[in-house]
A protein has these predicted regions:
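Conserved HGGG/HGGXW glycine-rich cap/lid loop of the alpha/beta-hydrolase fold
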Residues: 16-62
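Conserved hydrolase catalytic core segment
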Residues: 90-132
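Active-site loop/oxyanion-hole signature of alpha/beta-hydrolase fold enzymes
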Residues: 54-95, 111
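N-terminal membrane-anchoring alpha-helices
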Residues: 1-5
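A catalytic-pocket lid/entrance helix-loop region that shapes and gates access to the active site
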Residues: 124-152
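A short loop-to-beta-strand scaffold at the N-terminal edge of the catalytic core in hydrolase folds
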Residues: 7-17
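Conserved serine/cysteine hydrolase catalytic core
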Residues: 165-213
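Conserved catalytic-core motifs of eukaryotic protein kinase domains, centered on the activation segment
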Residues: 36-38, 63-69, 130
């Protein structure tokens, strides 16, 4: 499913569906098991009119985990490198979910010629993080519980029930959910989210933006 590309010494998965020259890049929010499988129904529907591309960040889905910085500009750099290596060319319509709004806004600010439009799916805007109360102890406990296999005793709590997945895909999803529940990359994402929000501009260049809750 998709292709593996090497970025900064880590394997990243890039999934492409559809042949239209108009390209939508789907960016997932934090903490899901596999963006490719989670967005399956969306990508299948959109691929009838667009080329749909899903990049699984390190720590997600079929991609490797990573202990590298999760600074928003580093994450953006990895996404752009993965697209380049998969021979996916812009400009792009970028559809981002939840916390991935930070990456898409940073992308539009730094590389405006690559961004044709932004689509926000339940966006978390930079200002939303100002009063965020972080609970790193909870994340750390969950991380180590995942590492020692404790969370395997509660499988139904840690993956999204997706009726569009085949039995084989559902089994893959469960395995990925166990493997990637709280990887290092997601732990580092949680620690840097407030700092990343400060690096994203509160105002952006004029562009078509659609937001859905």
């Amino acid at each position: 499913m998709g292709q593996q590309v090497l970025v900064n010494g880590h394997q990243m998965k890039v999934y492409v569906e559809g042949n239209d020259p108009e390209t939508i890049v789907l960016l997932s929010g934090a903490g899901i098991a596999s963006p490719i499988l989670d967005f399956k129904e969306v990508s299948e529907s959109l691929s009838k009119r667009y080329k749909v591309v899903i990049v699984e960040r390190v720590g997600y889905g079929y991609s490797d985990d990573s202990n590298y910085s999760r600074d928003v500009m580093e994450v953006l750099s990895e996404t752009r490198q993965a697209l380049s290596q998969a021979n996916v060319k812009g400009p792009f319509i970028i559809s981002s979910h939840s916390t991935a709004s930070l990456e898409s806004l940073a992308w539009q600010k730094k590389y405006p010629d690559e961004v044709k439009a932004l689509i926000g799916l339940d966006w978390v805007l930079p200002s939303s993080y100002e009063d965020l109360k972080e609970n790193q102890t909870l994340f750390t406990v969950a991380y180590w519980s995942s590492k020692i296999g404790l969370l395997r005793y509660f499988p139904e709590s840690f993956y999204i029930k997706n009726p569009t997945l085949t039995e084989n895909e559902l089994e893959q999803y469960k395995l990925l959910a166990y493997k990637q529940l709280i990887p290092q990359a997601i732990l580092h994402e949680s620690r840097l989210v407030k700092e990343n929000a400060k690096k994203v501009p509160s105002s952006i260049n004029p562009i078509l933006i659609l937001s859905f809750l």
